[in-house]
Amino acid sequence: MASEDKKSKREHIIHFEDTASKSLDEVNGSVEVPHNAGFWKTLAAYTGPGILVAVGYMDPGNWITSIAGGASFKYSLLSVILISSLIAMLLQAMAARLGIVTGRDLAQMTRDHTSKAMGGFLWVITELAIMATDIAEIIGSAIALKLLFNMPLIVGIIITTADVLILLLLMRLGFRKIEAVVATLVLVILLVFAYEVILAQPNVPELLKGYLPHADIVTNKSMLYLSLGIVGATVMPHDLFLGSSISQTRKIDRTKHEEVKKAIKFSTIDSNLQLTMAFIVNSLLLILGAALFFGTSSSVGRFVDLFNALSNSQIVGAIASPMLSMLFAVALLASGQSSTITGTLAGQIIMEGFIHLKMPLWAQRLLTRLMSVTPVLIFAIYYHGNEAKIENLLTFSQVFLSIALPFAVIPLVLYTSDKKIMGEFANRAWVKWTAWFISGVLIILNLYLIAQTLGFVK
């Protein structure tokens, strides 16, 4: 009898759901939307999921690439950021459309249309991508805590585990609270870099010219490598899974054509607006790198280098001050914290969607966090908290994102182009072929970037 009770408790803690379970069940359809309201009131109701998705496009993993791009080639790579952002808008709109029309997220759809063995394989690949994303966020947060409070890196890494408790509290308060907290953190990042760029006084005409693509991006090997880094970091695999799930947090009747159509319209507007904000932040990072570090011998390849440079008048000139350095660290912490919230949600979506593993929220999020914290902690202990060595881990973590990209993009384009799945909401011909072209280019660029990172291509 006692053994049966123990078995029952284990099954309650960890069990496998049937395939019909909803994505992020605790918040699915939890946000009411008006039915006969005007444009702005309706948009306000749908605004929120886009900001959670946009966070992935300005996480700590993107910072170094953008700033280094500006420091090395001034404003020339702004065009790459623009093109990358437009690609992200298209793919994220497709992810949201998939979730709204089918009521299934990308992980669930992929699992539904593959064998059990293939589903398990895809889960492992995607889980590694989540870990890679989380590693960048943990490292960014831990370094920010050290810069702000002189906290040992190992202690900072352990403290980031507490994000799980914050997320649990926010989930109890409602999904809109999560959206509000993340939006506040993103606003902090935007304001900090806008302020620092204004102080840096960039050359505006030259800056605007940087948004026009030019041949040097392809012909110059160093410029091409940094461009690949920017593009490779733009489309984050976990964001496609996340977007397809949280688009379902708005309560609609999928049997009513007009409600589905309206949900797609306003979710796409929300996504594009928030990704525009991410585009602005990434532009500001590159502009800051160009205005302050172009033509100097200063290294800006690491967070600590950037922090120190902002208070060094020999590098950044008269605007140098400890305040600029502190603001940079605050923005880094805000970026890390906002990204960990969305990364943990994506981890839950992927685990439940691919292998139908259902766990209590605290166990699910603790497991997701520990899977990412553990390798960083081991690395930090092994290298005695050396920042340079730990930031190298951040660089290599991006390789996993590149490996996982095809396993997210290809199914997304397949499912959203299939009329049997999407009905009349399937991709139009020009959207489908544009998406396939973009997917092919992204995959080739990422494979090339992997080969360069691992030293197979010089």
From Swiss-Prot:
The keyword Lipid metabolism does not apply. GO terms for molecular function: cadmium ion transmembrane transporter activity; manganese ion transmembrane transporter activity; metal ion binding; symporter activity. GO terms for cellular component: plasma membrane. It holds the Pfam family Nramp. GO terms for biological process: iron ion transmembrane transport. Coiled coil: none annotated. HAMAP family: NRAMP (MF_00221). This is Divalent metal cation transporter MntH.
